[in-house]
């Protein structure tokens, strides 16, 4: 068997796109037949890569929210901040047994959001409220 007759190790993008288009058009043209495209390799690869990309965007968005925390104001706990701390401990009791660093990040984010909501001098916050 020559090398031209063997299947390629990796499927190219052009052949994958052609295959998807042909399967979609053939499944739309035939009536009464349930298309089995979701079980094909190209569809599984597409959905897997898309879900990983979506998950990466969610993680980056969460990290961007953490970076936006005002780092020096979160350590000056006022009575309102202590009340917020106890309030979020009541809402998320499972966080007491988890990682302490993760607890600190969530607490700092919650306290910062609470402080931003109390601070009416922010011009962009006035537009939102």
From Swiss-Prot:
Gene Ontology CC entries for this record: membrane
Membrane topology note:
Multi-pass membrane protein
Q: List keywords of the entry alphabetically.
A: Membrane, Transmembrane, Transmembrane helix
| Compartment list | Membrane
Q: Where are the transmembrane segments?
A: 49-69, 72-92, 101-118
Miscellaneous comment text of the record: Almost completely overlaps APS1.
**Which named protein is this?**
Putative uncharacterized protein YLR171W
UniProt source species: Saccharomyces cerevisiae (strain ATCC 204508 / S288c)
